[in-house]
From Swiss-Prot:
SUPFAM superfamilies with a match to the protein in the record: CheY-like
UniProt GO molecular function: RNA binding
Gene: nasR
Keyword line: RNA-binding, Transcription, Transcription antitermination, Transcription regulation
Record-linked InterPro entries: ANTAR, CheY-like_superfamily, Nitrate/nitrite_sensing, Nitrate/nitrite_sensing_bac, WH-like_DNA-bd_sf
SMART domains, per database record: ANTAR (SM01012)
Biological function: Nitrate- and nitrite-responsive positive regulator for nasFEDCBA operon expression. NasR protein binds to the factor-independent terminator site located in the nasF operon leader RNA to effect transcription antitermination.
Originating species: Klebsiella oxytoca
Residue ranges of every copy of the NIT domain listed in the record: 37-284
GO BP, sorted A to Z: transcription antitermination
ANTAR domain location: 323-384
Species lineage: Bacteria, Pseudomonadati, Pseudomonadota, Gammaproteobacteria, Enterobacterales
Lineage top rank: taxon: Bacteria
Name the record gives this protein: Nitrate regulatory protein
């Protein structure tokens, strides 16, 4: 009964086709990993050019002229590699991926006009930073679309880890640009300060996602080398809580150099993530070489069912994990709302008892949090706890 069909030519053809398609999909997987690596390298070069252009504009054309030229040359060199990596992905790309690539490719030629305006100092530093950031954003948007076509959990996890890390690194790059702008001017407006705070706060969720999915060697290197240095933390405190000194750009260069060193360390981890992704894809490709075009000799319905069960079990576990994550996210959202309420109450206390404006109260809470190396909600909670002990009459 089990051998009724036998190894007929039709059966052999179907197994051979399955092997060929599997190998083709693995080749596409390797190509997607290569494309992600080229995007990462191009984004890093653009971040370098954005930073140099920002200092050039903020210094009134006194500093970083050579760095601007070098940055542009490195970007152009990497662009050639990026376009070459696009070609193998063209035939197998989904419509959604094609849209993302089209948007990025549409913005890239605008670099020439942007560079001319920077070189001639016909553009404000904020606008130049925004245009560089827009180009980078469209390049980064390609990466998650690559992940949608990956059905191997190991490769998918590595791709998400890489994308999360790239997002966090880009926020660190924007932090460098915004901080350099404020320090060079000797003044942080409320809007610029809020933008800086948003970039600082936005990095942690990205790096948390990276650490949850990356391999131990990469997370260990990140923890060892990529945290914000003491100098960065001190300058962050100045930028977020008071106006910087007017020192003809000296503090701006200190900030820029410290942030650049951190970005280069982040790039080192990013390169490890890419190597690990490509190695994992190559290992799958080598491990799936067909040993024969025929099915195994003991192939039968029971063994097929067993293999299907083994394939379904990880999916079930993955769904359970996703549900657990969703529950955790909902709980985190609830906690975040409660924390926000505590901070608002603490602001009200400062406004009532110290006669502060809302912005002043917020800045005071943030400064206390930075000085004590604590979260703002912890300061707010402590303030509300001791409120009952105050014997100060509220100011009119």
């Amino acid at each position: 009964m089990n051998n009724m069909a036998g190894n007929t030519p039709e059966v052999v053809d179907w197994f051979a086709r399955a092997r060929r398609l599997q190998k083709q999909q693995l080749h596409q997987l390797a190509q997607q990993g290569t494309l992600a690596g080229q995007i990462s390298a191009l984004v890093h070069m653009l971040q370098c050019e954005r930073g140099a252009s920002n200092i050039w504009l903020c210094s009134g054309g006194r500093l970083y002229a050579a760095e601007c030229r070098a940055g542009a040359a490195l970007v152009d060199e990497q662009l050639t590699r990026f376009y070459a990596a696009l070609e193998p992905a063209r035939d197998a790309a989904s419509s959604a991926l094609c849209w993302r690539i089209a948007c990025a490719v549409w913005y890239l030629p605008q670099l020439a006009a942007l560079r001319k305006r920077v070189r001639d100092r016909e553009i404000a530093a904020e606008e130049a930073t925004g245009q560089f950031s827009r180009i980078i954003r469209h390049l980064l948007n390609i990466v998650p679309q690559l992940n949608d076509s990956i059905d191997d959990p190991q490769i998918a996890g590595r791709m998400v880890a890489l994308y999360s890390f790239m997002q966090g690194k880009e926020l660190a790059g924007q932090e460098r640009a915004l901080g350099a702008l404020g320090f060079a001017r000797g003044q942080f407006s409320d809007e610029l300060r809020q933008q800086l705070v948003d970039r600082i706060d936005g990095q942690q969720p990205c790096f948390d996602s990276f650490q949850a999915l990356a391999q131990p060697p990469q997370t260990a290197l990140f923890a060892e080398q990529c945290q914000a240095s003491l100098e960065i933390e001190q300058l962050r405190r100045v930028a977020c809580t008071r106006q910087p000194p007017a020192d003809e750009g000296e503090t701006a260069l200190r900030w820029f150099c410290a942030q650049t060193q951190r970005l280069e360390q982040l790039r080192g981890v990013e390169e490890l993530l890419i190597v690990d992704l490509l190695n994992a894809a190559d290992a799958l490709l080598e491990g799936e070489e067909p040993e024969a075009q025929l099915p195994p000799a003991d192939w039968q319905e029971d063994s097929i069912a067993l293999r299907l069960d083994k394939q379904l079990l990880p999916l079930v576990r993955q769904q359970a994990h996703e549900l657990q994550q969703l529950s955790g996210q909902l709980a985190s959202l609830k906690d975040a709302l409660e924390e926000r309420k505590l901070i608002e109450k603490a602001k009200s206390v400062l406004m009532t008892y110290q006669g502060m404006q809302e912005e002043q109260a917020w800045q005071a809470l943030r400064k206390m949090a930075m000085d004590k190396n604590q979260r703002m909600v912890e300061i707010a909670r402590a303030l509300l706890t001791v409120k009952a002990l105050w014997r100060v009459t509220p100011k009119e």
